[in-house]
Amino acid sequence: MMMARKQDVRIPTYNISVVGLSGTEKEKGQCGIGKSCLCNRFVRPSADEFHLDHTSVLSTSDFGGRVVNNDHFLYWGEVSRSLEDCVECKMHIVEQTEFIDDQTFQPHRSTALQPYIKRAAATKLASAEKLMYFCTDQLGLEQDFEQKQMPDGKLLVDGFLLGIDVSRGMNRNFDDQLKFVSNLYNQLAKTKKPIVIVLTKCDEGVERYIRDAHTFALSKKNLQVVETSARSNVNVDLAFSTLVQLIDKSRGKTKIIPYFEALKQQSQQIATAKDKYEWLVSRIVKSHNENWLSVSRKMQASPEYQDYVYLEGTQKAKKLFLQHIHRLKHEHIERRRKLYLAALPLAFEALIPNLDEVDHLSCIKAKKLLETKPEFLKWFVVLEETPWDETSHIDNMENERIPFDLMDTVPAEQLYETHLEKLRNERKRAEMRRAFKENLETSPFITPGKPWEEARSFIMNEDFYQWLEESVYMDIYGKHQKQIIDRAKEEFQELLLEYSELFYELELDAKPSKEKMGVIQDVLGEEQRFKALQKLQAERDALILKHIHFVYHPTKETCPSCPACVDAKIEHLISSRFIRPSDRNQKNSLSDPNIDRINLVILGKDGLARELANEIRALCTNDDKYVIDGKMYELSLRPIEGNVRLPVNSFQTPTFQPHGCLCLYNSKESLSYVVESIEKSRESTLGRRDNHLVHLPLTLILVNKRGDTSGETLHSLIQQGQQIASKLQCVFLDPASAGIGYGRNINEKQISQVLKGLLDSKRNLNLVSSTASIKDLADVDLRIVMCLMCGDPFSADDILSPVLQSQTCKSSHCGSSNSVLLELPIGVHKKRIELSVLSYHSSFSIRKSRLVHGYIVFYSAKRKASLAMLRAFLCEVQDIIPIQLVALTDGAIDVLDNDLSREQLTEGEEIAQEIDGRFTSIPCSQPQHKLELFHPFFKDVVEKKNIIEATHMYDNVAEACSTTEEVFNSPRAGSPLCNSNLQDSEEDVEPPSYHLFREDATLPSLSKDHSKFSMELEGNDGLSFIMSNFESKLNNKVPPPVKPKPPVHFEITKDLSYLDQGHREGQRKSMSSSPWMPQDGFDPSDYAEPMDAVVKPRNEEENIYSVPHDSTQGKIITIRNINKAQSNGSGNGSDSEMDTSSLERGRKVSAVSKPVLYRTRCTRLGRFASYRTSFSVGSDDELGPIRKKEEDQASQGYKGDNAVIPYETDEDPRRRNILRSLRRNTKKPKPKPRPSITKATWESNYFGVPLTTVVTPEKPIPIFIERCIEYIEATGLSTEGIYRVSGNKSEMESLQRQFDQDHNLDLAEKDFTVNTVAGAMKSFFSELPDPLVPYSMQIDLVEAHKINDREQKLHALKEVLKKFPKENHEVFKYVISHLNRVSHNNKVNLMTSENLSICFWPTLMRPDFSSMDALTATRSYQTIIELFIQQCPFFFYNRPISEPPGAAPGSPSAMAPTVPFLTSTPATSQPSPPQSPPPTPQSPMQPLLSSQLQAEHTL
């Protein structure tokens, strides 16, 4: 119903007549009062439809047309409006005017002949078919406009708008207008229709006229006035709506807004529309080449465009568009101008950089000069049309050359003047820099390390400050400081080399004591080169420590002359001389699978490693071969993307030994993964023999697949990568360039670069060199070492040329890159000589460890350091080895003119005389010396060959029978880290056997060598004593293959096997490895030896052996012989300085004197020998305040628990030696609490308590042990050396502390290493008050183990096992079961049941060694634990007895050893390893020796 009512309501319609002054020009003036404009704006308010010109002068035809229709009024049409009360209405608008004839200029005659005043007041208007009026142009062209007739041809007027023009009209008097209006109003009032006064043209209004109009309105009753402006569209609608409100009384009264307030609102509306339109134009129009037609079409539908066109019209919109286009063009030209002006100084610098050429030229002349330059057209372009900014050149974006007519502008002239001034200033600044640098070089106050603040006052003046900033001088000063500091460091390094004897005499290790560092500073303190670094004490100390590291760990990399180390030069010379290897080397290369193999780890998360591996494989051949420098290599890739601590992601495996690692990243997260993985990998190998992963060559690569080398993120990643590469000391490769190819992470050039670097590193580590066989070494008659000094001013090529160019020179069989073979006639026979050419620092390690028949030592006569190194080297050479000194000079003239050369030549000659060596000098200017020069020396070597070899054999066997600790204290005695350019021990790659020989095939050659050696000795009467003495040593010592054990006497007829093994061990040590190869890192021969139990080097006392001691403590203690001289250099093996010797105590030399060192024969050698006896070997940690106390105790005689009491000489020697080794104070030592890593900082309620307190009947296994074993079995069963390699002590302590606080600790979450967890588990058992295997049970276990029958023995052990306390039995069963599972993975982890038993028996049993029986039972303890691990199913799970591996009847391990000593019979058996010394005569085990050996092999 409501809807129907609304539809029935009819829209009201009002007819309004607009009237005002009209007539001829005489009455209204030159223009009308604006009635037509008012009607036009109201009916058609759009700016484009608004017309200002509406003429009233018409022709007769126009007046008679259908629009005017012979009437003096116009029908404007119908308008629909919504008034203020939102009610819509319709209005018909009529304008009463008076049309003038264009001929007579008098009003046209119409049907109504009344005057205008009466005609205008008419309320009934009729005109048939009268059309709606638009504008003057419509007249006569009605068909071109919309034709809409006045409704019904008649209208009834409802109200009047009475217009008054308040502008200053031409030829019109305002007072006359008011009179006309007054008369018109009176006539209108008669109609009783509403009237509203409309003031038109208020935008041009006169204030007086407006005021008079308002006064007129006030004189009339209820006459309202509306101020309007049709042109500005102000209050037009208000005038009509006000009239409608008067017509319809029911409507609300309209508020009349003053003109200026309405104008302000209208202006704001227009301004807003304009802003929006301009924004639209700027968004759409970007180029100054756009045109209005296309842009207006684009904007047609935009409301911003529509609103502005409605208010201001299309023409104004177009005008704004053209202004925007002009602005764009201007901005474009200015940008181009700035670019040209910015490039102009660069053009000046390129074309006229010389001030002398243009110093006095004007800009015009300089312009002509520019045209003559060859590169003129590269910088400038000459245009046909000018100026350039009005030509099409502005749109030629590809041509960036400068328009030459720009030079005519003022800015270009200014830039030219600026260029001249810049050149002049640069010349002056260069002069100032040069003068400042001269001041620095001549000033005596500028010393290395002096801060700028201190130096400034000495060298600065006002002129310097005037021309340059202080930062420039600081930069020059910094560079100068760097130069003089580098020079001072080089000189200081030379000083350190000149004092080489001091460093070697002090026997420095990796961590020198404060006392030794003090001695170094005291000795060097008065040297000017030492004082030169006074202000750089930290760097000076660092250089000293670096030099100490070089002395202790001499390699090509640590060599002060690196990369010009002699070893590298020699390798290059020898390798280039023998390009084509011998047949034997070819055969070895073919048989060695790693000779041409590169193992590469690729590390990168999120698929980076896998993708790069695929890309590299795509560059390889079908069989994964890669060509480098024309040679094909086998490439083995191992991509890793996960946790490197997991076995599946380990860097190395038993079958994969990495030679290098590519580290990939493409984000901060992947870079963090690389850093964490490298650190974890390095941590996991610390303390292991195969810790070469710490020095694994790394290459860090930023993967940038698209080759994009821009962007802040990429630059940030590059900077971070460079920082990490510097931290890791590895190579950093920039991202691949864009031209590599789509989808590539790295290009082939970079891959080749990486692989070449790996090959170089691999060669340096000698990973590709083959090991010399014993047969190869046996073929050599003499082994000579030629020593050269790194950094000497001579060419190694000149020295080696006579050797390498000799027809007798051949490649070395052993594959060494430093050795050659010579066949020279010496005497009546030809001798095969192996000549090894090494640097001095490489030669130090072989003086005692390798068989050398003679040394040829070179030194430069004009370099002090060269002779000093020679002296240091000769100090530790035995006096039986011939020496050839060779001095290198610059010629006879230089020797005469140079005092230093003369002095050093004289000193070298005197040294040669004192040591009975040979001396010669060779001028460096001499093209080549001749090899015959050394023939007298070679004859000396041949004469002394037998005694040298006999002495070397003696020393090696004696060393094998003494403590292993003595070998590792001094760098002279074979530095443990001395591996310069020589082959590393291969034993780090594969687990060493527990037998003395792994390959039986080498035994026959050994026996032949023994026979040969015997016959040589028999023919030499002068060596009878040495041979007898040598055999005596063998009869009294057994070489310990695992760790030092007590020396024991036994008869040859009973224990030939042990003797033969001892002799062969000495042979193997001296001959089986490559000649001249230094010892590797600390490498106990027994792989299963726990690293945390390896005895560290001791000071002052000689360690006889180390055994687990004190059952209540579980510590590793050392029994020492304090009779050994304390100041013998500890590890150098020199017997000459010993008052007595553990090897030769009680014997007297009767025939031949024992060899001594050259230091004792030459007064010029060992000038710092006094410091040698002043300090014990050790670091600060070992040389604490206890040293004084120990010295006092040693000087007071034989005191203390471990002192060895001397016995009478008539006592049985075997008994005396045993008791010397094992004699302890009869007073039993007081039990001491076991030092625990977990008790250091807190009291634990879990560790170190009785086992019964941490288990319950429901949980018989300690939860800590359960967690550790679960973690190890989940992640570590494949870890190489598990339980052998100790974990980090601090991590083990942290693990126990955290577990003590939280028994629910998740080991996997904490990311502990497997070795840390394994070590913590062993520590748990070590800290128990009583061992897991009770003491009472240990005696029974040993008795059961003595049973010969294997099956009976196992059942007896099982019966003893049943007597264990329940808690101990359950935990023991759990641990042994775990170890059994570990041993099943021995192919991967290399831990057999035997290895595991060696690691675990001291932890599980902790025997007391206060008695001889307990000591000799150590082998039994280990074997018992091994049986428990092997036969775990039988002992704990009622399974049948399993057969041991490798015990088949007739196998070598099941046969008794029968090899006689020093015979040529080939050895065919392989005896059980002597893990402990053989039983003594006092031991109850002696009668069972043979049967026990047989039984143990059977087991």
Curated annotation (Swiss-Prot):
GO molecular function terms attached to this record: DNA binding; GTP binding; GTPase activating protein binding; GTPase activator activity; GTPase activity; phospholipid binding; protein-containing complex binding
Modified residues (Phosphothreonine): T1226, T1480
Biased composition (Polar residues): 1124-1141
Tissues expressed in: Ubiquitously expressed.
Domain (pG1 pseudoGTPase) ranges: 592-767
Ranges where the record places region Has GTPase activity, required for proper localization: 1-266
Consequence of changing S1451A: Abolishes phosphorylation by MAPK, increases functional activity and enhances retention in peripheral membranes
GO biological process, one term: Rho protein signal transduction
Transcription in keyword set: yes
Phosphotyrosine: residues carrying this PTM: Y308, Y1087, Y1105
Residue ranges occupied by any pG2 pseudoGTPase domain in the UniProt entry: 783-947
Name this polypeptide is given: Rho GTPase-activating protein 35
Gene for this chain: Arhgap35
